[in-house]
């Protein structure tokens, strides 16, 4: 899911590429519909009632940050497909890349803070620090949102600086994107600036996320042992809460893993830009992105209630 690598040009008018582009766009539409529902349902409640649960504030922010990038991807995919030999650092693509980097970074941080919230609120560790966090965490949600926007903006500016330097090098030396010297400039910037920057900015939220996931799995294991001893099993409310949270975190895990694999593959040059394998990989990633909001929708009680009301009103039942 690398915005920078969706801009280099080569002809891709063969039938397989066209089919994969169509599939990618359809998956984007599914992701747009799911994230739009989450954002609209919780956003309307926030506006009308002037209040929202802390967890739902994180969820609606995540839905909005996932909703917007899908339009960026659709716009960039359409542009690259129509203009496969377009200059990779022209103003249109640089503007789209800036939006992509900002929204992508925001998604990572919103997902991370939501996983922290699930872990602290649902896990039942008795350590004093953990109990203190459980009591204080809801008050910190606004700071989580502001820090996500601030960190995302900061890293996006750093990405923009790197891309701008490459653009200036192309202009200064009158190079073309397919020129050997031009490719070496881009490769140098990717290897020694963009790749390390991506590793740093993506490793921090991902490490926090997986720590929370491990803690939640540990807590679930303890509860399962107690539930089996009391013969309540999966009917135990605490076990059910753990399982629902785990389903949501698994959907996050798919996104985090796809981000890192995309980063490694692009850095290693395994999938050349606009190669057939590149579009296959993009389709797999956006399949994960399409499934993600669906899992979130069915793991959230409030969203399930809204969906049920929508289905009832559509069927004409009270």
UniProtKB/Swiss-Prot annotation:
Keyword Transmembrane helix: yes
Pfam families named among the record's database cross-references: TAS2R
Xref: Gene3D superfamilies: Rhodopsin 7-helix transmembrane proteins
Note: Most taste cells may be activated by a limited number of bitter compounds; individual taste cells can discriminate among bitter stimuli.
PANTHER family for the chain: TASTE RECEPTOR TYPE 2, TASTE RECEPTOR TYPE 2 MEMBER 60
Protein name as annotated: Taste receptor type 2 member 60
Keyword check for Membrane: yes
InterPro entries named among the record's database cross-references: TAS2R
Role, per record: Receptor that may play a role in the perception of bitterness and is gustducin-linked. May play a role in sensing the chemical composition of the gastrointestinal content. The activity of this receptor may stimulate alpha gustducin, mediate PLC-beta-2 activation and lead to the gating of TRPM5.
UniProt subcellular location: Membrane
Membrane spanning residue stretches: 8-28, 41-61, 89-109, 129-149, 184-204, 235-255, 265-285
Molecular function, one GO term: bitter taste receptor activity
Tree of life domain: Eukaryota
A GO-annotated cellular component: plasma membrane
Membrane topology, Cytoplasmic segments: 29-40, 110-128, 205-234, 286-318
Glycosylated residues in this chain: 179
């Amino acid at each position: 899911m690398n915005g920078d690598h969706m801009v280099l040009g080569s002809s891709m008018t063969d039938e397989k590429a066209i089919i994969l582009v169509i599939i990618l766009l359809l998956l984007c539409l599914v992701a747009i519909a799911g994230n739009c529902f989450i954002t609209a349902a919780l956003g309307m409640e926030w506006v009308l009632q002037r209040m929202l649960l802390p967890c739902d504030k994180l969820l609606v922010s995540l839905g909005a940050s996932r909703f917007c990038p899908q339009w960026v991807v659709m716009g960039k995919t359409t542009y690259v497909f129509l203009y496969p030999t377009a200059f990779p650092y022209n103003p249109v693509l640089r503007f789209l890349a800036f939006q992509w980097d900002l929204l992508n970074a925001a998604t990572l941080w919103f997902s991370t803070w939501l996983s922290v919230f699930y872990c602290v609120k649902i896990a039942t560790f008795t350590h004093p620090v953990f109990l203190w966090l459980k009591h204080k965490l809801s008050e910190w949600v606004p700071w989580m949102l502001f820090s996500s926007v601030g960190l995302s903006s900061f890293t996006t500016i750093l990405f923009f600086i790197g891309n701008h330097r490459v653009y200036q090098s192309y202009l200064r030396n009158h190079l073309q994107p397919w020129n050997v010297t031009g490719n070496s400039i881009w490769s140098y910037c990717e290897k020694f600036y963009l790749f390390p920057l991506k590793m740093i900015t993506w490793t921090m939220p991902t490490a926090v996320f997986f720590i929370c996931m491990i803690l939640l799995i540990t807590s679930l294991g303890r509860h399962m042992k107690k539930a089996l001893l009391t013969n309540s099993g999966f009917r135990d409310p605490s076990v059910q809460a753990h399982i629902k949270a785990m389903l949501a975190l698994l959907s996050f895990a798919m996104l985090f893993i796809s981000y890192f694999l995309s980063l490694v593959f692009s850095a290693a040059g395994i999938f050349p830009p606009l190669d057939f394998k590149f579009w296959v990989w993009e389709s797999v990633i956006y399949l994960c992105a399409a499934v993600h909001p669906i899992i979130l929708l069915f793991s959230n009680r409030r969203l399930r209630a809204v969906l049920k009301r929508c289905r009832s009103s559509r069927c004409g039942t009270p």
